[in-house]
Design a protein with these regions (language model features):
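Cyclic nucleotide-binding regulatory module and flanking cytosolic helices
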Residues: 2-46, 89-90, 94-96
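Cyclic nucleotide-binding regulatory domains
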Residues: 23, 33, 48-109
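Cyclic-nucleotide recognition modules
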Residues: 31-32, 82-140, 144
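Alpha-helix/helix-capping structural signal
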Residues: 65, 88, 119-120, 186, ...
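Residues that scaffold the ATP/ADP-binding catalytic core of kinase and kinase-like folds
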Residues: 71, 92-93, 123-124, 165, ...
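Polybasic "coupling" helices that flank or enter modular domains
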Residues: 126-193
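Phosphate-/nucleic-acid-contacting segments
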Residues: 169-234
Length: 234
């Protein structure tokens, strides 16, 4: 269920939007006009459902700002697939595949999401080679990242996978050695296929070894070299 705080149509938002700028080209006025007239920006609060598994996909969805988690309900339990940082497209394989959302996406922070008419987006792909190429690159990078996470989950121990998560938050998501965990320890355990007790124990060990400092949900990485070694060898 959506808990939408506001919906608005922005006449000039598309000119400077990263959705356009990331394609490394200046779209023609006709294309910009088509985007301006066929999109809606929705603000979601932390915890709101952006995409729900099993529902019909009718729009291209672009995360303009904020953080979200991608998760799927399997035969036995719900599995967190990955954490998504803006700017990023959400659910493109579903939108251009069988049109039924194969996973859910939930906001981990307040987030602005752009819903773009799928037919207009298809036209942009056909008319703009550079834009189409940027979308292909996005999909390829996402797939390679999924392969890497899958290999790590199955071949690394919990200690190494937890180090990966902390390094990912530090280097990719927050770009800082001091950050607040956007997910609970239970969610971290789900993300790395471990138990909450193991996550809690490993975090305590990392604090005891002065590799990290933890105050509530705030993490400060004190010894990144050691954390990287744990990631590589554990």
């Amino acid at each position: 269920m959506y808990h939408i705080h506001y919906i608005c149509f922005m006449e000039n938002e598309c000119n400077n939007c990263f959705c356009n700028a990331k394609s490394a080209l200046t779209m023609c006025e006709k294309c910009i006009s088509a985007l301006n007239s066929n999109h809606a920006i929705v603000r979601f609060a932390k915890g709101d459902s952006i995409i729900k598994q099993g529902t019909y996909s009718t729009n291209v969805i672009f995360l303009r700002n904020g953080l979200a988690k991608m998760h799927i309900t399997g035969p036995s339990y719900e599995q967190i697939i990955r954490i998504v940082k803006a700017p990023s497209y959400l659910g493109l394989p579903t939108t251009f595949g069988n049109h039924i959302n194969q996973y859910s996406i939930t906001a981990l922070s307040d987030a602005d999401v752009c819903f773009i008419d799928i037919n207009v987006f298809r036209s942009l792909l056909k008319e703009n080679d550079e834009f189409s190429y940027s979308i292909i690159l996005d999909l390829c990078q996402s797939e390679l990242e999924s392969f890497r996470h899958c290999a790590n989950r199955t071949q690394k121990q919990a200690r190494g996978n937890l180090a990966d998560v902390l390094l990912d938050f530090s280097d990719t998501i927050y770009q800082s050695d001091i950050f607040t965990l956007p997910i609970s320890q239970s969610e971290i355990s789900n993300l790395i296929d471990s138990s909450r007790e193991s996550v809690s124990r490993i975090l305590s060990e990392l604090c005891k070894d002065n590799i990290i400092k933890m105050t509530g949900k705030q993490i400060e990485i004190l010894n990144k070299k050691s954390l990287i070694l744990i990631s590589q060898n554990a």
